[in-house]
A protein has these predicted regions:
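Glycine-rich beta-alpha junction loops
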Residues: 12, 20, 40-44, 63-65, ...
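Glycine- and other small-residue-rich loops at beta-strand/loop junctions that grip anionic moieties
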Residues: 14, 18, 36-37, 56-59, ...
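Active-site-adjacent helical/loop segments in soluble small-molecule enzymes
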Residues: 22-78
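A conserved regulatory-domain signal marking ACT and ACT-like small-molecule sensing domains
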Residues: 91-188
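A generic structural signal for well-ordered coil/turn residues at beta-strand boundaries
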Residues: 12, 53, 61, 107-109, ...
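Alpha-helix capping/termination and helix-coil
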Residues: 20, 52-55, 74, 88, ...
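Glycine-rich phosphate/pyrophosphate-binding loop at beta-loop-alpha junctions
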Residues: 1-31, 71-116, 126
Length: 188
């Protein structure tokens, strides 16, 4: 192999985002490395959320590469040491990574439903979500989505859930009530 230069690098692991690896490092890696694992940003987001929720640690994305890479390997019943490093992350980035992680895990999701424009419909939808143990964290009520706005309004509901199965349960209950929910991009 040889050292190659990438035209660009885009990753949330900015501490390791280099177009060209160092010339001194390459011969060492060539001699001692068995394999290279690439880690997508989505896996780093999940690893970050795991560290915050389960270990109460803030580790910057580059420092989590080993943890995220381990999830791609069969390491069950093996003794593994994963080196964690760095806490150099600003709160805006941290907030964004946490939100993306919650969305990936279906802990937060947004649905859009079209409702008749009459009193009681919002309460009906909120009751269905509450009965399914979902927690409404944001509502957007838009009367101007339909050409025939006197008859229909769009309601976008951002919901907190316990994960993928719970999200599916909530969506199924909305569907069973005839609401035809559509999953849309979370906008918090």
């Amino acid at each position: 192999g040889k050292v190659v230069t990438l035209p660009s690098v885009s990753t949330i692991a900015d501490g390791t985002a280099v177009k060209t690896p160092g010339n001194r490092l390459f011969p060492y890696l060539q001699k001692n490395l068995d394999d290279i694992i690439t880690v997508p940003d989505e896996d780093l987001i999940v690893a970050f959320l795991d560290m915050v929720e389960n270990h109460k640690m803030i580790v910057e994305n580059s420092g989590l590469l080993t943890v995220a890479a381990l999830k791609q390997l069969d390491v069950k019943d093996k003794k593994i040491v994963s080196i964690l490093s760095g806490g150099n992350m600003d709160v805006i980035t941290m907030s964004s990574v946490v939100q993306q992680g919650l969305v990936q895990r279906s802990r937060i999701f947004t649905v859009s439903v079209l409702l008749p424009d009459k009193p009681g419909e919002l309460v009906r939808v909120a009751s269905i979500i509450a009965e399914a143990n979902g927690n409404v964290i944001k509502l957007e009520h838009n009367q101007f989505v339909s050409i025939n706005r006197k008859a229909t309004v769009e309601l976008r509901i951002t919901i907190e859930a316990f994960g993928h199965e719970h999200k599916d349960e909530i969506v199924d209950k909305l569907e069973a009530a005839g609401l035809r929910p559509r999953i849309v991009k979370v906008n918090i």
